[in-house]
Amino acid sequence: MKILQNKQLVKQTLILWSAFLILACQTGETPSASVDSMSYLLPESSLNSIESHLDHAGIIEALDEESMKRGGRTYNYNCINCHGNMEVEGSIPLATKFWQDTLKVGTDPYSMYQTVTRGYGSMPPQMHLTPRERYDVIHYIRQNFIKEENPEEFSSVSRTYLSGLPKGDSLGPATKPYHPWSDMDYGNFFINTYELVDAETGPERYHSPGPSPFPDEDYSANNFAYKGIAVRLDPGKGGIAEGNAWMIFDHDLMRVAGGWTGEGFIDWDAILLNDRHETYPRTVGKLHFETPVGPAWANPATGSFKDPRFRARDGRQFGPLPKAWANYRGLYHHGDKIIISYAVGQSEILEYLSQEESDGQIVFTRELNISKASSRLKMRIAPAKYQVAMSGSGASLSQEAGFWILQGEDIAKANIKLFISEPGFAQIRSVAENAAPPQDLSVFTQGGPAHYPQEIESVVTVGNDDNAFAIDQLTPPFDNPWKCRMKLSGIDFFEDANLAAACATDGDIWLISGLTSPTNTLTWRRIG
């Protein structure tokens, strides 16, 4: 019986991994000079109904300089990542180099449209683009690369050619903004690398120009949180992207890197977000306060704030502080509250980031529950130019060497609330006096209601068991309440072969049941 269970588990593993590879991206080229309907990754039955009504000739005839500009933006925003250009190598060596390679499935616009729409070899279907956007980028590739640099592969468009294309009466839907990375409900926190900047006064984004290897940029004055936990502070639905006030906790250095307000959260520039390579997300909006890159808490053994971490050749320091100094434990997500847990020396700390408002002025708050320490703790809150106040007991507030300093007292514990605002906000002490007292944050570490109680069903397309290797295709729930993109990246199984857990590159985690069900129906529940 145990052997049968293990065989079933192995089969399910092969089925799931094969399905995920098929659904995520195809990584092998098909060595074929001709194309039939089975060579494309996406069958005709999976295409949108609009595809059968497209006026291909009408779209192609309308291509112009504006189409070239739009197509260039699409290519340099998306396609360049894999294909590269004449100066920069793409990330996939086998991806077609339009300026020198022989195209496997035709160079006329309609043949290229089939490749872009349905996928072929290592080229996944680009169904997120409208038909006109697909033809725009094809126009850019044909005119900019093939016609100019690879003329042997260029095929002209004639009246005879256009008359032979499939007939239709639609140009497809109008182009709409496409930003699924910011549409998704990630929840009220999001862990990433961030640069904190003010939209009006911050430094302009800079990358070294030219082909790789790029020379080092000078980021010595930039405020990066490499292990940043961004937390939404204002109430409301939609997760962190729908908020209008945030703070970032840097768990390398146990510092709050800053707080900002605005619309949009970040600019979403990152390979795992909007697919842009060699970049990082920046905050967007008004930066109300920030702290310099460096330890927030003094070394409990020496009282020094000197940063001991690895220094790279460009002068920046990376990595966490030594564990004896500070150690990030994790976080608790209770309702809409995010409780961050870490240790400084022998002292355990729970921290909750939030906000207060007074006469339209936002005040950023930090609640800290600090256990008794074996040595007196000292924390840099913010540079002295900002307004800072405190309520609660067990610590004192002062200024030292250009910073507001929180100094722990020799008592059993501290339970305090810090208030931080822009320079010149004189009412901050009044806000602190009238605000609710600091809470016992341990209450929010005991678990709470499920954040994602919904269950979603999808189907299994069963393969042929007569062959040596059977593949069943599992359909992820692309249509889900949180607009998760379902970019599945990992899977693990339970002892019960009917159950699996999968994670996605966007951070969502799913519990899957029904793997051995005869109904060929899967049930998905988001658990993180």
What role is predicted for each listed range?
Residues 65, 72, 84-114:
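Gly/Gly-Pro-rich "capping" loops immediately C-terminal to redox-active cysteine motifs
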Residues 155-352, 356-365, 382:
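Beta-strand-rich N-terminal accessory domains
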Residues 385-387, 392-450:
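Extended acidic/polar, glycine-enriched regions
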Residues 457-462, 474-476, 498-528:
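Beta-propeller domains
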Residues 22-24:
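C-terminal motif of bacterial Sec signal peptides marking the signal peptidase cleavage site
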Residues 33, 50-58, 65, 76, ...:
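Flexible coil segments in periplasmic/lumen-exposed cytochrome c-class electron-transfer proteins
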Residues 71-86, 137-141:
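The canonical Cys-X-X-Cys-His
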